[in-house]
């Protein structure tokens, strides 16, 4: 172990055998990330839970009794926070988590293993909720290729699809929150969100790694409304 510039102990992982440098760096980052340790101690499935906690503490998106949709939910960190904040753990609000991957059960969360891009996904979702959603949120990230321009377009395309889904299921006044990355490729996305929502802003919670271009687009005051 070594100490970093703050005086904290820093775990170093040796490269050996078949371990690649990229794997070594990822493992070191995980071992030295305070949010990873905090998530484990709090029983959260991922460090991403703290990102939603920080955003919600500031903007008060999740209120008791709300209906929430978590797109690309696995492993479930955001769904855990939403269930507590809207009261679905106590049967008051409702949280539906959607993912292509299987996800272990979470108290107060209804899970649907499906592709939200399917044409019938909005109808299935509103049937599960018994109506429209108050919040649609997504911490998804597109698979990357290593080619910067291609990756930027993939990321923006995924968010655009998530936003279109949100517009199909949100109630009037609803909220859309999604992960994005700082680039010049999202001008059309932001323009569309500004047409559909009263307020659109970017936020970067402290739990987002500071050396990452990751940030979140937060759109509030949906101007439309889910079809009955």
Swiss-Prot record:
Query: Which residues does S-adenosyl-L-methionine bind?
Result: 76, 78, 99, 115, 139
What are its E.C. numbers?
2.1.1.166
Catalyses which reaction(s): uridine(2552) in 23S rRNA + S-adenosyl-L-methionine = 2'-O-methyluridine(2552) in 23S rRNA + S-adenosyl-L-homocysteine + H(+)
Q: Where in the cell is it found?
A: Cytoplasm
Xref: InterPro entries? RNA_methyltr_RlmE, RNA_MeTrfase_FtsJ_dom, rRNA-MeTfrase_E, SAM-dependent_MTases_sf
Q: Which GO terms describe its biological process?
A: RNA methylation
Q: Can you quote a single GO CC term?
A: cytoplasm
Q: What is this protein called?
A: Ribosomal RNA large subunit methyltransferase E
Question: What are the top taxonomic ranks of the organism?
Answer: Bacteria, Pseudomonadati, Pseudomonadota, Alphaproteobacteria, Hyphomicrobiales
